[in-house]
Amino acid sequence: MTVQTFIPNGAKAASENTVTQPTHTTDVSIKKLYIETQGCQMNEYDSHRMADLLGDSHGYVLTNNPNEADILLMNTCSIREKAQEKVFSELGRWRKLKEQNPDLVIGVGGCVASQEGDNIQKRAPYVDMIFGPQTLHRLPQMLDQHHAQVEKPKKEKIKLVDISFPDIEKFDFLPEPRVEGFKAFVSIMEGCSKYCSFCVVPYTRGEEVSRPLDDVLAEIAGLAEKGVREISLLGQNVNGYRGETFEGGICTFPELLRLVAEIPGIGRLRYTTSHPLEFSDELIQCYEDLPQMVSHLHLPVQSGSNDVLKAMKRNHTIDVYIDKIAKLRKIRPDMHLSSDFIIGFPGETDENFAETLQFIKDLDFDHSYSFVYSKRPGTPASDLPDTTPEHVKKERLAQVQQVIKQSSIEKTDAMLGKIERVLIEKVSDQDPNILVGTADNTRLVTFVGDASWIGRFAEIEITEIKTLNLVYGELLNLEPDVA
């Protein structure tokens, strides 16, 4: 099996002009759609697909202004209690807009929608549609149903709530994705089957289901043809991908990476979010074999204490995690590592936290998504006794974030004098002679160059550190277009 099977006929290098920008409008005669996205990159991807879907089916175009929208959609996150309460706070503001414009349609999707269902309408009865992550492709039909029953008496109206977990069918009904620059997210699987004791994802997005291999490769090949040069593969447990092949076999995540790397035009590969249990030797080998793999990895560990990991039901030890990172850094010594940390998990002792803090220092993390533990209803951890005072949890969190911030500063400073491979993305807003791009480690890199280089990769020597995430440099080599 080769990747050529999945590349559209006539695929070729795309010029800068093939990359379309987001469609926004101020024309009052055009139907307008506003989407608020909360949470993870999966939600970002889903929101883009909602816009594609309603644009294709009903002619809606995106607006940045909710006050001028005909439809307001909220793509929600339930990973933490604060995020969930933010949903109803924002809906309260949207209620005022609906009072001013009774024809305004309000829809709630994402994980809070999946978790709460029609309870959302009980608390916010002005919400017209509720849909889950796996049913967003049914939005056009739900919208039609809404308009068809607008004039009906309230008692005759059907509640428009669809939060089911059908087989991974939504991708069969989504239009071709719109391209917005030289980077793109591609969702390759949905859900998670790990059932960590703190996590709502298996309950809000369902069990792990992988997209068929040919669907994934065809989407990526189509994006490459339109000028996309960097692909980020998405999934709640992305390295657990097990996609069915057209021959009836199963493609693993490392095998998928190797096939994607063969697609003309794709010069850089990222992925998120992964689980340590399935961060295999085969996956690590891809970092040695595939130059498209970036030297940046987000691998959530959640805690540096084995006792806490056991309570979290992570099913691995700290030594397992350390061993995998050691193997990876033997291949890529410059690997930048980020992770997730939950601080103040029920039962976390001072000793447990000290272990976590030392672990963070030892592994030299570049970045983290770190939060104080938030109890989520229906999860096993919600029944655990929690005796740690909130102020102690916040103090611990501050220590973690300070250690990681200092490590990040040091890693940025260490870039001085080094050569970075940069994807050139745009002209600077401040100076038309300055180009802006992204390094493997996600830092923004600016340098003097020509706008015709946009969309290509370049080797840049870093000459000045400006901020934590911004560096200056000089061009050493402009790579040919990778298409």
Swiss-Prot record:
Database matches in PROSITE patterns: MTTASE_N (PS51449), MTTASE_RADICAL (PS01278), RADICAL_SAM (PS51918), TRAM (PS50926)
EC nos: 2.8.4.3
Span of domain TRAM: 413-477
Keyword hit for Nuclease: no
Sites where the protein binds [4Fe-4S] cluster 2: 192, 196, 199
SMART domains: Elp3
Coiled-coil region list: none
A single GO molecular function term of this UniProt record: 4 iron, 4 sulfur cluster binding
Primary localization class, coarse: cytoplasm
Domain spans labelled Radical SAM core: 178-410
PANTHER family: CDK5 REGULATORY SUBUNIT-ASSOCIATED PROTEIN 1, MITOCHONDRIAL TRNA METHYLTHIOTRANSFERASE CDK5RAP1
Subunit architecture: Monomer.
Protein name: tRNA-2-methylthio-N(6)-dimethylallyladenosine synthase
Organism this protein belongs to: Acinetobacter baumannii (strain ACICU)
